[in-house]
């Protein structure tokens, strides 16, 4: 009878492990992990697994019979449960990144970004939350691309992964020929400095520097010297006469334009913008979008914008609709709208 019970416990634990099989090397390894947990302090354990709102929780629950009665026993149980659960999560979830391809080289003459079966989950304590659930897509050079989706859809996570701000949990992320999933942190930092520019909803200007000096920060971080000059950039953003202003002397729209200038000073191959008009009024928002369109058309810079506003998506020639962590639709627009003609509300 005891043997049957033991087999049942191992079987239940094995089933729970199989739920995250993609990051496990083999069933043998998984069962070894289970046996280690069962031998820990010679105390039997049970595994509890629950699924709620797309989240998976893995908890080790020690059996009641191994502890003293009353509050003292409860504290012993809670302490051991915490130790076991944490160790279990590390053993199971901290596996090597799984890549989909071997020795694959994307067509750089056409596709600047290519994703293959990209997944992303976040681990908080012992809670795993899947955000991206298998993304496959190819994006062309020199396109104006909008990533569109509601709050919580995974659009910002998607942007962070293709820009090198975050790493995928699984799959391949090819950007400019490099598989970002395989880059070490130091190489990822170098990649961001050399090849991409960022514009965020928060301007993050240095308050003790002028507009020009803030833009030059971006220029100094880059090794490229063949891009636009600072004067040309401020001409592009329509602020050539305001280069010596400090952030406190500028409106929100002007500060956002300076943040664009800072990104352009790196002469990036790709310009990423996360909700760049989110904190601006309609007039300033349209001006910022006009600048992004101008950069895309005149300098052939690939521009990728994240937004929740479907009207802004009309200015793009490629629109990626993301919903619940997957690409719901991929739209190509042969005649993008002018930022001044789109509805704003």
Where are the regions a protein language model picked out?
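ABC family nucleotide-binding domain
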Residues: 108, 112-322
């Amino acid at each position: 009878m005891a043997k049957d019970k033991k087999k049942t416990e191992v079987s239940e634990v094995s089933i729970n492990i199989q739920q995250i099989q993609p990051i496990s090397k083999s069933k043998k390894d998984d069962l070894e992990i289970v046996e280690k947990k069962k031998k820990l302090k010679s105390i039997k354990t049970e595994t509890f697994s629950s699924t709620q709102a797309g989240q998976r929780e893995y908890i080790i629950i020690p059996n009641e019979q191994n502890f003293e009665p009353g509050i003292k026993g409860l504290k012993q149980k809670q302490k051991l449960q915490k130790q076991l659960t944490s160790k279990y999560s590390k053993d199971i979830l901290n596996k090597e990144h799984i890549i989909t391809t071997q020795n694959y080289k994307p067509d750089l003459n056409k596709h600047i970004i290519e994703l293959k079966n990209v997944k992303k989950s976040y681990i908080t304590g012992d809670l795993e939350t899947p955000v991206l659930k298998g993304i496959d897509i190819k994006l062309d050079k020199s396109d104006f691309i909008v990533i569109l989706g509601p709050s919580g859809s995974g659009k910002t996570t998607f942007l962070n992964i293709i820009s090198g701000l975050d790493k995928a949990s699984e799959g391949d992320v090819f950007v400019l020929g490099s598989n970002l999933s395989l880059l070490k942190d130091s190489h990822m930092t170098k990649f961001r400095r050399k090849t991409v520019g960022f514009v965020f909803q928060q301007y993050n200007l240095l308050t003790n520097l002028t507009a020009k000096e803030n833009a030059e920060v971006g220029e100094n971080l880059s090794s490229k010297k063949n891009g636009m000059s600072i004067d040309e950039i401020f001409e592009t953003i329509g602020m050539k006469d305001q280069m010596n202003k400090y952030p406190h002397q500028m409106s929100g729209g002007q500060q956002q334009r300076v943040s664009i200038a800072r990104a352009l000073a790196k002469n990036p191959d790709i310009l990423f913008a996360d909700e760049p008009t989110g904190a601006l009024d309609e007039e300033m928002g349209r001006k910022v979008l006009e600048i992004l369109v101008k950069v895309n058309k005149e300098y052939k810079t690939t521009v990728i914008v994240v937004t929740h506003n479907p009207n802004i998506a009309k200015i793009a020639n490629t629109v990626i609709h993301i919903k619940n962590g997957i690409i719901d639709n991929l739209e190509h627009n042969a005649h993008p709208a002018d930022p001044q003609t789109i509805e704003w509300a």
